[in-house]
Amino acid sequence: MYNRVLENIFWAEPRIRCNCGSYALGVDTWFWPVVNRAEYSMREDEIRSLYICGENEETIMEKIIVKDVSNILELCPWIEQIDRSKITPNDTIIAYRLALTIEGTYDEQDDCMYPDWVDEDFHFRIRENGVWTEKCGSGEIQVCDDQNWFEEEGCWDTGYMCYTSSVVYFRFR
């Protein structure tokens, strides 16, 4: 349910119920970028399969982000995707990015890399009134350290993960 009045989200509900997605998108429950929650639990298997088939982390993130954007737009009809070049200084902007780390074992006999460990996460940030803020998991809302989040290079470092995929932008309709 859409609710941009943050006091209703963060004072009426326990803070732990809201993550980066619920904060940025204005929903009152923990937000996952999937239509069916079971889909998110299968994500690691999909990542492993793509990696075994020779895809690198960057390509895997881009494939996942395409699915996520479709799901986000389906779940949140009050927002639209916007190209970075069309963003105006007064727009309230939501930015979305992924992090992915894969550690694997190389098997020379099969000439394959087997993923032993996969760590994947998503993150949203929002710019309102020219200020970028975020909410990491069940933590407090905070102002982003670096306010130049239109940079595609580098990472969004939340202290937990480094988000390095391309950035997807949304705005409220």
What role is predicted for each listed range?
Residues 42-139:
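...with weaker cross-activation on analogous glycine-rich loops/strands in unrelated enzymes
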Residues 18-20, 53, 76, 112, ...:
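Generic recognition of cysteine residues
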Residues 10, 29-31, 77, 116, ...:
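Residues in intrinsically disordered, low-complexity segments of regulatory proteins
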Residues 15, 34-36, 82, 136, ...:
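Short, isolated positions within intrinsically disordered regulatory regions of eukaryotic proteins
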Residues 131-173:
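Active-site or metal-binding loop neighborhoods of secreted/extracellular toxin and effector enzymes
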